[in-house]
Amino acid sequence: MFDQKQKSLALEFARSLSKRDYRQAYNMLNLNAQSQWTEDGLREQFESMIPLDWGDIDPIQLEENPAWDEMFLYVVLGGDSYSEAIIVNSFASDDEIPKIDSFQFGRP
């Protein structure tokens, strides 16, 4: 089960990406995830999912479901025509600060 700090971090990560603040989003990743991603990589993947002409990304919210709550956090990124998502699979701590260790873009 994910705790409230982890849920808040997943939401803040999605909000940072939605604001196109890739540096802030990158800094929410732990060292392992940072070794696999760059700020430009985050931008490219996010903008291939949600292009610049998408419009407002609203709502940004956790969708909870007992079937998957033990496995991952599902953050909905709402749009006018359809929604997308960010799935956060795991967290780790760097110097006792919770960070995102593994995530993926897009709906399953």
What are these regions (language model features)?
Residues 8, 12, 23-66:
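Short solvent-exposed beta->alpha transition segments
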Residues 1-15, 19:
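Short, low-complexity N-terminal intrinsically disordered segments enriched in polar/charged residues
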Residues 17, 26, 30, 76-78, ...:
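Generic alpha-helical secondary structure signal
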Residues 3, 14, 47, 92, ...:
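Compositionally biased, low-structure terminal segments
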Residues 54, 59-108:
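Exposed beta-sheet edge and beta->alpha loop/turn motif
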